[in-house]
């Protein structure tokens, strides 16, 4: 129970700190941009792919296309195929991954709006990032048991974004799910 209790405390503190980082007007602007995008591309790696694919799944349920290329080669191909109708999300807790800058530069050349999500103080390329969403900086990247804090803060932000996007066209999205659920979910009740 000690581990469960410590994780509960960590999760509560991380979500609270991430909530306190949120800027309402920025969140509304980001949700609007994502809602209007023809395609949302998420660039990330390692454990953050789980968060990206969870967001992708939720967006698919309301008819929004999200692409999560898994490796550096496919990320670069996806960047090359992007245009101004795409919006890119960069998920990187530290903001220091070597793949970020080349992708940001090319997205900028292609006229793609960029939203980066990372720990407080990790926007190292503000000239290429349209919106930066801060998450709790409660994790030490080199001194940790696992990515508990960064994972829960990233998941929380992506869930907040999905909920905000859903709410923009709530009636339409509810209708889409209602009319599509039998095809999406083939379980029989």
Segments (PLM) and residue ranges:
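HTH-adjacent hinge/linker in prokaryotic transcriptional regulators
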Residues: 1-25
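N-proximal short alpha-helices
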Residues: 3, 7, 25-28, 73-76, ...
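Glycine-rich phosphate/diphosphate-binding loops that line cofactor/substrate pockets in enzymes
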Residues: 25-37
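Glycine-rich phosphate-binding loops that contact phosphosugars or nucleotide phosphates
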Residues: 35-156, 160-169
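A short, charged, Gly/Pro-tolerant segment at domain boundaries
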Residues: 171-189
